[in-house]
């Protein structure tokens, strides 16, 4: 079998719905024009990230099998790298040689890669190659990764945005009733908001804790919007709420900062969502910088590299809770002994109620795939096959495709 063609389609971030417009702390919150603490700047992400949300990758073969992968939270340069560089490296080769092809793509892109868009491009191609492998033998990809560890996958509700106290309380209660054991809340404030912001961050954590009680775990996501000093003070205030983890308190390159924060608090610190390859994640592990590792299979190097990252994490006894809950991610989790849960983005009732009749309801990549996974009592079924089992919604892809 040989690869005959590789294509990449840029998908508009509009496909993600309004959730990326809600009030949220981010790595850019230190600059007023990119801040959305009060919800009055809904275009804040598009202002610094541009219009592209996902890049859908399709790898065609002479056996009539087409593999599908994608890179998310993307940039238009990823599609260019795939079509102008990676395609020339893999066309004419056997798609089953995934380890070899990964190494060829990585080495060829070192002059402009090693992290960032180049590794995201490799990730998309690698996921498509895994899809081909599963489709060829008519098995789900998790069977090729070692087989399922369990017959379902625990997941946590990751859509708690503090739009208002009313919606936050209602949404948290909804997730309790839906059977989730863990919920994740977005922080609102960083150093630029001073003590007032700290009090507000604590207030929304306290509100959620009051709603979910002591039985459910709460995680808090700072999305790289804090400084080391601020994070240490903030974690000190939040320790009494027994958080499951505080996510990405500072920028990913500040490994020493992560380690300092982690050593200063009883709250587990998580990171890795914006890290790349085994070498990047190894630095986090060796510095004891995180208690939870969160690689993204669409960013870290695909399934080939994320499996290596998980193996590294196991030698440090650090659990892996990957960023995003896409089908490729679920296949990884299904076959990993040290990946205890998946991220899931529920669509809350208050959001559904305010949508015009017939409007699309989606979060992140759901809109461009048919039949996204749905949990029952906080458990997701094993992802379908053959391959990755994510069929493209061609109508939606055509609607959101960018030239």
Residue ranges with predicted function:
Residues 1-56, 72-78, 89-94, 102, ...:
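Motif-centric detector for short Cys/His coordination patterns
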Residues 55-62, 372-373:
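Short beta-strand elements
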Residues 60, 117, 126-162:
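Glycine-rich, aromatic-flanked loop segments that form ligand/cofactor-binding clefts
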Residues 236, 242, 253-270, 275-377:
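Shared catalytic-loop signature of beta/alpha-barrel
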Residues 3, 64, 86, 125, ...:
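Conserved, mostly hydrophobic/aromatic
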Residues 44, 60-136:
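Metal- or metallocofactor-binding catalytic centers and their adjacent structured scaffolds
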Residues 1-18, 26-43, 304, 326-403:
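Flexible C-terminal active-site loop/helix
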Residues 151-265:
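Metal-dependent enolase-superfamily TIM-barrel catalytic cores that perform enediolate-based chemistry
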């Amino acid at each position: 079998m040989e690869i005959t063609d590789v294509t990449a389609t840029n998908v508009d971030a509009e496909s993600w719905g309004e959730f990326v417009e809600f009030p949220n702390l981010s790595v850019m919150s230190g600059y007023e024009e990119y801040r959305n603490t009060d919800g009055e700047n809904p275009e804040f992400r598009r202002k610094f990230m541009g219009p592209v949300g996902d890049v859908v990758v399709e790898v065609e073969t002479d056996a009539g099998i087409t593999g599908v992968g994608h890179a998310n939270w993307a940039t238009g340069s990823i599609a260019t790298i795939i079509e102008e560089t990676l395609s020339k490296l893999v066309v004419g080769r056997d798609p089953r040689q995934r380890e070899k092809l990964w190494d060829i793509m990585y080495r060829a892109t070192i002059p402009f890669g090693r992290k960032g868009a180049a590794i995201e491009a490799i990730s998309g191609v690698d996921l498509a190659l895994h899809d081909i492998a599963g489709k060829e033998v008519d098995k789900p990809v998790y069977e090729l990764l070692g087989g399922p560890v369990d017959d379902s996958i625990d997941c946590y509700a990751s859509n708690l945005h503090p739009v208002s106290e009313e919606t936050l309380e209602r949404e948290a209660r909804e997730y309790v009733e839906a059977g989730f054991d863990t919920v994740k809340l977005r922080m609102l404030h960083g150093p630029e908001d001073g003590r007032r912001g700290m009090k507000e961050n604590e207030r929304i954590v306290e509100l959620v804790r009051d709603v979910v009680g002591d039985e459910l775990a709460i995680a808090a996501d700072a999305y790289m919007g804090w400084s080391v000093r601020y994070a240490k003070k903030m974690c000190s205030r939040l320790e009494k709420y027994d958080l499951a983890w505080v996510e990405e308190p500072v920028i990913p390159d500040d490994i020493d900062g992560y380690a300092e924060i982690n050593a200063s608090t009883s709250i587990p610190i998580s990171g890795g969502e914006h890290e790349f390859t085994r070498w990047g994640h190894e630095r986090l592990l060796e510095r004891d910088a995180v208690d939870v590792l969160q690689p993204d299979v669409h960013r870290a190097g695909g399934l080939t590299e994320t499996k290596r990252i998980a193996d590294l994490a196991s030698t440090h006894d650090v659990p892996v809770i990957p960023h995003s809950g896409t089908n490729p991610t679920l296949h990884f989790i299904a076959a990993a002994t040290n990946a205890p849960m998946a991220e899931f983005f529920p669509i809350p009732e208050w959001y559904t109620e305010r949508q015009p009749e017939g409007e699309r309801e989606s979060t992140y990549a759901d809109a461009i795939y048919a039949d996204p996974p749905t949990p029952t009592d906080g458990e997701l079924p094993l992802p379908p096959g053959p391959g990755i089992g994510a069929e493209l919604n061609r109508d939606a892809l055509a609607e959101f495709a960018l030239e």
